[in-house]
C-alpha cells in the first residue's frame, strides 16, 4: 500500500528573497528511474522568475512524496527503498510539478564494485586524503594512495595488511574496517560514516560479497556539471550543483554525493559537501568538481541588486568587443568610455615597445585631427614590428626560454638572444618557433635554439618545462602520483618524458676544455655542446620500475617510437598542431595577459579545469583567429590593440567600478622592471649606464639577468631559471617605492648634467613651456591650467628655498675656523 509522506523542504529556513516572483517550476530530471537498492538521484527544482531568470527552488518548495518505493530528503536527493513506483510533488504558492519515480532491482543482489563503488566512498569520507591515510607515510601504519589514484595498491593495503584483520566476513558489522569508520573502535580520524546510512550499507555489502577486487570494471571517462554558467539573482541565495559521471561502457551515474565540489573564490561563494553552494556577495567564481580522477568546472555569477541598470549599445571595433560586450550585458555591467588620445598613445606605446612615447610623438599624435580610430589604428600598425617592439618582445621570449649565462655562458646567452630577436623581427610564425626549439640539433652556438637542451638536461625537467611553456599545463604535479586537481596521470608524466629520453649532448670540439659552472653542488658542463638524437635511452616509471613508452596524453596515439624524424619531431608536430587544444590557446592568453595585466585564464600559464576562462567565447575566438592567421603574432597584437576593449578608460562608472574580470575598464598596472628603468632614462633624456653593458643600452636589450643591476632586481626582473611567469614580480612594496623617491637610478638620471632634461632647464626661459615639456615626457599629456599654476608656484618656492639654503651655508662657512 502506498503511503503519503509530506516533507517541508525549507532546510535551514531558506526562503526566496523578497521581490522575486516565480512564474513556473521545472524539475531536472523530469522522471527518475532507480535500478538497484544503492541507486540515488539528486533532483534540481528550478523556478523561472518573471524577469526571465532562473533560481534554485530545491530546498524552498513544499515536497510531497506519494508511495514508499523511494526515500526523498528535504534537499532533493531520492534513494531506492523497494521495487515499485512513487511520485514526488513539488509546490510553491499556486505552482506545482510532479516527478514519477520507478524503482527496480532492490531484491536482486547488486554487485558492489571496489573500483566504482567502494573507492568513491573512501574518497568522500576523506580516508585517502593527504591529511589522512593518503599522506606520504600514511597514518598509524596504514597507507592508501592519494585520493585513490591506485585502486590495486589500495585494495592490497586494505585486504592484505596484517592478515586481513580489517574484515570479519562471518559478522560484517564487527569488521574493523567499519568499526573504525563509525567510531565504534578507536580512530584518530574520528567518525567518518554512521551505522545504517547508505555509505555504511554499501561498504557492508561489499564485505558480505567477499571483499572482491574488480580492476576490469569500466572507469570514469568524464563528468558533467549542472547547471552550467548560471546566474544567481542575489547574494545569500543557494544553488544545488548536480554531477553526472559517464563510464567507459557508456553508462551514466549521478555522483553528486560522492563528488568533491569546491569554490574557486570563497569570498564570492562557498560549497558544502552535499553540493549546495551558498553565495556571499556579488561577483563570479569558478566551481571545480572532481570525481575519481575526472574533473570539470563551471562558473557561477552572483548578480546582486542591479535595479536601474539599462544596457547601452556601444560601438565595436572587432570581434573582441562583440564577445566582451555580450558578457558585460549578461552580467549587467556597463563598459567605461574610451580612454583619451594621450592616454592611448602612452598605453599602447609602453605595451608594444616597453618604452613611453617621446614628447614629440605625443604632440604629433594629439595634433593629428583625423578620426580618433583611424589614427589609433595607424599608430598600432607603426609600433608593431618597430625596432623598439622587437627589443621588448625579444626580452619577453628571453625570459620564457631562460636565456641565462649561468647555463649558457656569455657567448651562448648572446647567441640565443640574437636568434630570438631575429625570430621576433621577422615575425616568425609561433608554431615554427616552437618546432625549431623542440627539434633543434647541432652546436648550441651555431644553432642557438639547441640551447634549450643545454639549460634543461633531464627528460623529466624537459617535459615539465615544455608542457608549461608551450601548453600552459603544469605536469610537475603528477610525477609522484596522479595530479590531485587535474586529469593528468602519473603514467602520462613518464610517457611524455620519454619523448626527451634520447636527447644526446657532447662537447663541441671547437671549444674543447672550456666549461661553465662547477661547484660542490653543480658539476661543470662544456661551454658549447652539440645536441643530437642518440637513438637510445628510456625513462623509468617511478612507481612500476618499468620503461615508459612515449605516448601523448590526449588526442592521438604515437604510431611508432622510432618513426622517421625521431621522438622530438613527433612531439613537436603534436604540440604545434592546430588541433591541439592548448597550444594556440595558451599563447593568445599570454598575449592578452601581457596587454591587459590579467589573462582570460589567470595566471596566464596555468590552464586547468579548476581555472576556467573568464570569457570562454572570447578565448575561443582569439584562438581561432590565431590559428587561421597561421600563428601570426603581430596580427594578434594588432587585433587586440585595435579593439575598443583594449582602449577602455581606467575611469569607472556606477556599473563597473567593482569589475575585475570582464575588461569593462582598464586596470592600472605597475611597469615591469626593464620598462620602468628605460622609461626613467627616456623621460629624463639621460644615458643608461649598466655595469657590464655598453653605455646607452636599454635594460630590455640586456642578454640576461647575469648583467647585474640592483634597480632591475628590486623591481622584479626574473632570474630565468624556470619558464614560470611567477618568476617576474610586479608587486608594490616599500623598499622599491622608496628607491623611486631617492634611489640612485632616479637620482643619477635627474642629476645627469648632459641629460636632455637638464639642458632644457638651462635653455628654456619660459617656465610654462618647461612645465609642459616635463608633463609630456613623464605623463605623455599636456598639463591642465591648474597644474601649470601649481607647478609655477612650486618652482618659485623651490627657488626661494634654494636661495635660503645657499645663504645659510654661506653664514655657516664664516663660522668655520681658518686653518
Predicted regions and their residues:
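Signal/transit-peptide handling
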Residues: 592-595, 698-704, 713, 736-751
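Sequence context surrounding c-type heme c attachment/ligation sites in exported
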Residues: 100-155, 166-174, 183-204, 213-216, ...
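Bacterial N-terminal signal peptides
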Residues: 1-8
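Primarily short, surface-exposed interaction patches in extracytoplasmic proteins
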Residues: 312-388, 393-692, 718, 726-727, ...
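Catalytic and ligand-binding motifs that coordinate phosphates/metal ions
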Residues: 682-714
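Extracytoplasmic soluble-region selector
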Residues: 10-124, 133-140, 144-145, 152-155, ...
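Short basic-aromatic helix/loop recognition motifs at nucleic-acid
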Residues: 165-169, 608-611
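Short, glycine-/polar-rich solvent-exposed loops and beta-turns at beta-strand/coil boundaries
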Residues: 136-138, 194, 218-219, 337-342, ...
Amino acid at each position: 500500500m502506498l503511503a503519503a509522506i509530506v516533507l517541508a523542504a525549507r532546510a535551514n529556513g531558506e526562503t526566496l528573497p523578497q521581490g522575486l516572483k516565480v512564474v513556473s517550476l521545472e524539475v531536472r530530471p523530469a522522471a527518475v528511474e532507480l535500478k538497484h537498492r544503492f541507486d540515488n538521484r539528486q533532483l534540481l527544482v528550478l523556478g523561472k522568475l518573471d524577469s526571465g531568470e532562473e533560481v534554485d527552488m530545491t530546498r524552498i518548495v513544499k515536497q510531497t512524496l506519494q508511495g514508499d518505493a523511494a526515500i526523498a530528503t528535504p534537499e532533493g536527493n531520492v534513494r531506492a527503498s523497494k521495487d515499485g513506483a512513487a511520485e514526488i510533488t513539488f509546490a510553491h504558492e499556486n505552482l506545482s510539478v510532479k516527478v514519477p519515480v520507478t524503482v527496480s532491482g532492490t531484491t536482486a543482489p547488486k554487485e558492489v564494485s571496489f573500483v566504482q563503488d567502494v573507492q568513491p566512498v573512501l574518497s568522500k569520507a576523506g580516508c585517502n586524503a593527504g591529511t589522512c591515510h593518503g599522506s606520504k607515510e600514511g597514518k598509524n601504519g596504514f597507507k592508501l594512495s592519494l585520493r585513490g589514484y591506485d585502486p590495486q595498491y589500495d585494495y592490497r593495503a586494505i585486504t592484505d595488511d596484517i592478515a586481513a584483520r580489517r574484515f570479519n566476513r562471518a559478522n560484517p558489522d564487527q569488521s574493523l574496517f567499519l568499526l573504525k569508520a563509525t567510531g565504534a573502535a578507536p580512530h584518530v580520524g574520528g567518525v567518518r560514516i554512521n551505522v545504517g546510512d547508505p555509505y555504511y550499507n554499501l561498504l557492508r555489502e561489499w564485505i558480505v560479497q567477499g571483499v572482491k577486487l574488480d580492476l576490469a570494471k569500466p572507469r570514469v571517462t568524464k563528468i558533467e556539471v549542472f547547471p552550467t554558467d548560471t546566474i544567481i539573482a542575489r547574494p545569500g541565495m543557494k544553488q544545488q550543483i548536480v554531477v553526472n559521471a559517464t563510464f567507459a561502457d557508456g553508462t551514466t551515474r549521478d555522483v553528486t554525493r560522492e563528488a568533491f565540489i569546491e569554490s574557486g573564490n570563497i569570498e564570492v561563494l562557498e560549497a558544502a559537501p552535499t553540493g549546495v553552494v551558498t553565495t556571499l556577495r556579488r561577483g563570479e567564481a569558478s566551481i571545480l568538481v572532481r570525481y575519481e580522477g575526472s574533473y570539470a568546472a563551471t562558473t557561477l555569477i552572483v548578480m546582486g541588486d542591479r535595479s536601474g541598470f539599462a544596457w547601452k549599445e556601444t560601438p565595436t571595433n572587432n570581434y573582441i568587443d562583440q564577445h566582451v560586450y555580450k558578457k558585460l550585458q549578461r552580467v549587467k555591467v556597463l563598459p567605461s568610455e574610451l580612454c583619451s588620445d594621450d592616454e592611448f598613445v602612452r598605453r599602447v606605446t609602453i605595451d608594444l615597445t616597453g618604452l613611453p612615447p617621446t614628447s614629440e610623438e605625443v604632440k604629433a599624435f594629439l595634433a593629428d585631427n583625423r578620426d580618433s580610430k583611424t589614427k589609433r589604428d595607424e599608430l598600432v600598425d607603426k609600433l608593431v614590428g618597430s625596432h623598439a617592439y622587437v627589443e621588448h618582445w625579444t626580452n619577453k621570449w628571453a625570459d620564457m626560454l631562460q636565456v641565462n649565462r649561468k647555463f649558457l655562458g656569455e657567448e651562448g646567452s648572446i647567441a640565443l638572444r640574437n636568434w630570438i630577436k631575429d625570430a621576433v623581427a621577422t615575425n616568425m610564425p609561433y608554431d615554427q618557433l616552437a618546432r625549431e626549439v623542440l627539434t633543434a640539433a647541432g652546436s648550441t652556438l651555431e644553432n642557438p635554439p639547441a640551447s634549450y637542451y643545454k639549460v634543461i638536461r633531464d627528460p623529466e625537467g624537459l617535459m615539465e618545462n615544455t608542457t608549461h611553456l608551450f601548453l600552459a599545463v603544469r605536469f610537475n604535479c603528477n610525477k609522484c602520483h596522479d595530479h590531485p586537481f587535474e586529469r593528468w596521470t602519473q603514467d602520462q608524466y613518464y610517457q611524455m618524458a620519454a619523448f626527451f629520453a634520447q636527447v644526446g649532448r657532447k662537447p663541441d670540439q671547437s671549444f674543447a676544455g672550456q666549461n661553465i659552472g662547477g661547484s660542490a653542488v653543480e658539476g661543470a658542463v662544456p661551454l658549447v655542446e652539440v645536441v643530437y638524437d642518440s637513438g637510445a635511452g628510456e625513462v623509468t616509471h617511478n612507481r612500476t620500475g618499468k620503461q615508459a613508452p612515449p605516448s601523448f596524453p590526449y588526442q592521438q596515439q604515437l604510431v611508432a617510437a622510432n618513426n622517421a624524424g625521431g621522438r622530438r619531431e613527433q612531439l613537436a608536430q603534436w604540440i604545434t598542431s592546430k588541433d591541439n587544444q592548448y597550444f594556440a590557446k595558451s599563447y593568445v592568453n599570454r598575449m592578452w595577459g601581457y596587454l591587459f595585466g590579467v589573462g582570460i585564464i589567470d595566471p596566464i600559464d596555468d590552464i586547468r579545469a579548476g581555472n576556467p576562462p573568464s570569457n570562454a567565447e572570447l578565448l575561443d575566438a582569439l584562438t581561432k583567429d590565431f590559428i587561421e592567421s597561421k600563428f601570426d603574432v603581430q596580427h594578434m597584437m594588432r587585433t587586440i590593440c585595435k579593439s575598443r576593449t583594449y582602449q577602455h578608460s581606467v575611469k569607472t562608472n556606477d556599473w563597473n567600478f567593482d569589475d575585475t574580470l570582464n575588461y569593462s575598464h582598464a586596470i592600472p598596472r605597475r611597469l615591469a622592471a626593464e620598462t620602468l628603468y628605460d622609461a626613467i632614462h627616456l623621460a629624463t633624456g639621460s644615458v643608461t649606464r649598466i655595469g657590464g653593458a655598453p653605455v646607452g643600452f636599454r635594460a630590455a636589450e640586456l642578454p640576461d639577468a647575469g648583467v647585474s643591476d640592483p634597480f632591475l632586481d628590486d623591481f622584479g626582473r626574473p632570474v630565468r631559471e624556470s619558464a614560470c611567469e611567477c618568476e617576474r614580480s610586479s608587486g608594490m612594496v616599500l623598499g622599491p617605492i622608496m628607491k623611486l623617491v631617492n634611489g640612485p637610478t632616479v637620482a643619477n638620471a635627474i642629476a645627469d648634467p648632459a641629460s636632455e632634461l637638464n639642458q632644457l632647464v638651462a635653455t628654456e626661459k619660459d617656465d610654462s613651456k618647461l612645465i609642459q615639456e616635463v608633463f609630456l615626457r613623464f605623463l605623455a599629456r599636456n598639463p591642465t591650467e591648474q597644474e601649470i599654476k601649481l607647478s609655477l608656484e612650486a618652482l618659485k618656492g623651490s627657488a626661494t628655498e634654494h636661495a635660503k639654503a645657499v645663504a645659510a651655508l654661506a653664514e655657516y662657512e664664516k663660522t668655520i675656523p681658518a686653518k
